[in-house]
UniProtKB/Swiss-Prot annotation:
It comes from Bordetella parapertussis (strain 12822 / ATCC BAA-587 / NCTC 13253). This is Protoheme IX farnesyltransferase. Its EC number is 2.5.1.141. Pathway: Porphyrin-containing compound metabolism; heme O biosynthesis; heme O from protoheme: step 1/1. GO terms for cellular component: plasma membrane. InterPro entries: Protohaem_IX_farnesylTrfase (IPR006369), UbiA_prenyltransferase (IPR000537), UbiA_sf (IPR044878). GO terms for biological process: heme O biosynthetic process. It is found in: Cell inner membrane. The lineage of its organism: Bacteria, Pseudomonadati, Pseudomonadota, Betaproteobacteria, Burkholderiales. Keywords: Cell inner membrane, Cell membrane, Heme biosynthesis, Membrane, Transferase, Transmembrane, Transmembrane helix. It catalyses: heme b + (2E,6E)-farnesyl diphosphate + H2O = Fe(II)-heme o + diphosphate.
Amino acid sequence: MSSLAAPQTGLLRQYLVLTKPRVTQLAVFCAVIGMFLAAPGMPDLSHVVFGTLGIWLLAAAAFAINCLIEQEVDARMLRTARRATARGTISDIQVLSLSGLLGGAGMLVLYHLVNPLTMWLTFATFVGYAIIYTVILKPRTPQNIVIGGLSGAMPPALGWAAVADSVPAEAWVLVLIIFIWTPPHFWALALYRNNDYIKAGLPMLPVTHGQQFTRLHILLYSFALLATTLLPYAIRMSGALYLASALALGGMFVWYAWRLYREYSDALARRLFRFSILYLALLFGALLIDHWVGLLR
């Protein structure tokens, strides 16, 4: 039994890697925050559970398609060369079947157990990432992250729609925050993985415009991000607790970006990249805590 289970476990692990679980977790986390912010009190737990499940399934399906489309590119990059699609240990049909199963299940869950609006918005996000970003933008323009960032910024709106069956201005403010966060996050990665992107032939900003230009734009975007994160307080969507958190976290982001701009090192770029992930999680966590504190008043 153990000899039979080992290959099956290995295959399941390879499937899991194709769904980019860490990236999926952050996206779903932001969607869940949107769900709780959408309700004046406690949201309908069935919508939270099934909304989370459906969004996770479609996100995983999109990432699997991304790995399938980019398998030749991934094989040339050190960071992604071990993916099953890049090594050819999983066939195209297997990946398509996995994506179809996950995506189909996600759409059914969202349509029948949440609401049609959430399903269509999540499906549009799937198309935006798996097709428009991966196929059209990423291999053709250094602004791929800027233009294609909208699909990655959508989770709060998807979560909001799951609970409220609408997407008001407050939800789009959250989308805007992630949209502005995305370029400096990925450009930091592209800086210290520059050789990978050169080998892959992808026109990331450091490849096409150089390191100094990219570092300047990371710094400029960090200031824009700090300003954008003040919007929830400005429109009275959040209170002083969130404001203090946004200023502190934004100040740290600017500080990292300033250091990177003044004196580059791969270690600093890697540190900024990792901090940016923590930054987004803490910022959205602060939004939720501030929301709950407001409900208790």
